[in-house]
Amino acid sequence: MRAVVIEQFGLRPEVRDLPAPSAPPGGVVLDVEATGVCRSDHHAFAGHDDTVTLPRVPGHEMVGRVAALGEGVTSVRVGERVTTPFVEGCGRCRWCRQGAAQICPDQTQPGFTHDGSWAEQVAIRAADHNLVPVGEDLPAEAVVTLGCRFATAYRALTARAGLRAGETVAVIGCGG
C-alpha cells in the first residue's frame, strides 16, 4: 500500500510502500477515496503535538469505502461509503454515550494516535460508534470537510451556543 509517511519532525514527508492495515476487533479498514489536509496535520509533522510518535502516516479527514470488517462490527457492510469524525471515541464510556466523544478517555485520532488517511487504506477503530454513512451523490471533496471542520463548527453552534432549527447565524470568519 502506498502512503505518505513522516519519518522525522520538520522534514518533508515521503511516499512509501507500507503493509496494508488489518481491521482491528470492532473496527474496519477503509479504502481511502479522498483525504483532507488540515492545519492540525502541519502541527503534527512540525513537532508541535507531543502525543504524535514517528514514523506516522498523517491524515484525519477522509471518505472511503469499507474494505474489511473486524470482529463484532454490525453497523456497516463491505463496500459501504463512509466518513468518520476526527476524534474517534471508544463508544463504550459515559462520555461517548452522551455524545461527547471528544473527551473520551480512550479516544483515538487517525494521523495522530495511529496511522491516518494519507494512504490507500486506513484502519478505523470502534467502527459502530465512529463511522457515518455517506451518500453516493456527495462529492468526495465536500465530504472530507465534515469530520473535522464541520464537526467542530456544528458542536460549537448546537452544544455550546444552543442554536436550534430555524434560527439564523452569521459566520464572520473561518480558518485553522
Please identify what each model-predicted range represents.
Residues 19-35, 48-94, 135-138:
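Glycine-rich beta-strand-centered segment in the early N-terminal region that forms part
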Residues 90-172:
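NAD(P)H dinucleotide-binding glycine-rich loop of Rossmann-like/cofactor-binding domains
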Residues 40-46:
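Cytochrome P450 core scaffold surrounding the K-helix E-X-X-R motif
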Residues 8, 71, 98:
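Short, conserved catalytic or interaction motifs in soluble domains
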